[in-house]
């Protein structure tokens, strides 16, 4: 609850800052930052947003501008009072807005920004996290915000950043509509009252803001007047200001043609004060200019003013479309991904929509598909109506054509970027997930997007290769692109699944991001070559006649063992077969063509809102493949042929299956039982009799039906474990 104090007749409410905001302000105030000038950029950006909002509302209700038709930003330095004031005629804030937006409700980015700051990030990132207002405390010891919204009274917010702020009804000079921010500057920050400093800061950060930014300065100039006028003026000054504040009068002599003769009336020069006003951002919208006339520096400055980014963009596309439909667009790719790129609740405001240079909105979902939500820029249409509503936008055919063109130009830009290996590497690190999401969602552009993918492979080492490069290296008899999905490059490179494929000299693509699983569900082929997972059934490697003959012989030789293993494992596997993919591993678990891979199963198990009925169906399709050339499998076959009811055979089959599950990337349903089997085998290997073990109460997690292994009589025999 706020504290309420009565100052005369004024009611002043005091509120505590929300904890994270108080922490952020403390960080801003008590840490030294060299580039404090960004506070001006942030306040101008907030003013511009407020002006955008009132202009958008006025398109459907022109009376909203009755409280002030001019949409502008004024900057007023005052040396005497050591204040820097910024006034906008934007939408203003109600009392509730003032309390919520400036102190009691933390934005989602507050904590993320503090973490970034503590990790060494630049203070100039503040605008990207939605907390730019608080940068005012980089230069101010006290901030006063006076604001008037059409639906409320004029209020004043004030804080010296001591953990609290006050709000009261403002009885001072009415501002009509909008917001006035008064910064009471720290003693060592008076440079921001200087004309040159303000001008260069606005030019650097805010010259492309779409509203006039006017600087008001009190200046002096010399004025020539007659002695009589000087006397009159002196008297007036005395009355108005008192004797102490009279203007300094400078006598510059008299104008005489001949001394002592024909005297003319004497004149004086006095210094008078006046208010000089200068518009600081006269540059016309950059997207309306010819791209050939715009320098990279200008693009960079515009990008920074548009996005509040502290770094230059990575790439830019400036184009216009003419004909039946007319629009201009300027698109940028950031140098790095924002912290909340895939946050569902995030307001999408990366592309600003203008109609004939008038800003309409900055959250138009229909303008660009979700997978391109990192692209920043502006689109200026000549054909959309000025008063278009969101509902009309959803149905607009014009917008659908604009969207199609934007996607096409974005893909062109990505392809151009791909020609520069170093820059594309930076781009891919930040936005590869977006490209893969595009392959999953955008069937029209799937082929183009697939050309932009880059993966580590069994032949590229630390470098990444495109699928086009993979195809160019394919062997003559190779018909498919082989890939494996998993958690990391090292894990998949050492997987049993790639043993035979690599030994035969075929390249394997390593897919190590969870989104790759969704991507390959849609990307069935590339350049006429089918994508084949080496972890699924039906892997067919090119074979000569000798290899085919050997495979058939092994199938016959191990047929009875496969049948026995299927009986022992029952519903745990769909079938047991002889493998053509293993070299040094005794066995592996593969999934059916349409089932989930081990990696996909892991991803789905991690989903909080998973569908258990689907999981039960998809997870059941496991196939056990055995390596006919491995001594463990060969010895097991011999034991099974001798006595298929041998308990040791059954135990070893279960142990082999569970170990294969783990090595193939699956998880165990009952890891404790598996662990107990391993412990008993370790005891057997160490020659420890179960009778020698310390007698303790049985753990409830250890099933009673796992008897000790009979190690002394026959080291190879074990009790059956169900």
UniProtKB/Swiss-Prot annotation:
Pfam families per UniProt: HATPase_c_3, HSP90
Chain positions found as Phosphoserine: 226, 254
The encoding gene: hsp90ab1
UniProt-recorded name of the protein: Heat shock cognate protein HSP 90-beta
Protein family according to the UniProt entry: Belongs to the heat shock protein 90 family.
Domain remarks in the Swiss-Prot or TrEMBL record: The TPR repeat-binding motif mediates interaction with TPR repeat-containing proteins.
Entry's Gene Ontology cellular component terms: cytosol; dynein axonemal particle; perinuclear region of cytoplasm; plasma membrane; protein-containing complex
Xref: CDD domains: HATPase_Hsp90-like
Comp. bias regions, Basic and acidic residues: 235-251
Subcellular location: Cytoplasm; Dynein axonemal particle
HAMAP family assigned to the protein according to its UniProt record, in alphabetical order: HSP90 (MF_00505)
Motif mapping: TPR repeat-binding: 718-722
One BP term from GO: protein stabilization
Biased composition annotated in UniProt, kind: Acidic residues: 225-234
PANTHER family named in the record: HEAT SHOCK PROTEIN 90 FAMILY MEMBER (PTHR11528)
Binding site for ATP: 46, 88, 107, 133, 390
Protein source organism: Xenopus laevis
Additional information: In contrast to other HSP90 heat shock proteins, this one is not induced by heat shock or mitogenic stimuli but is strictly constitutive.
Xref: PROSITE patterns: HSP90
Region (Disordered): 221-268, 690-722
Subunit structure and binding partners: Monomer. Homodimer.
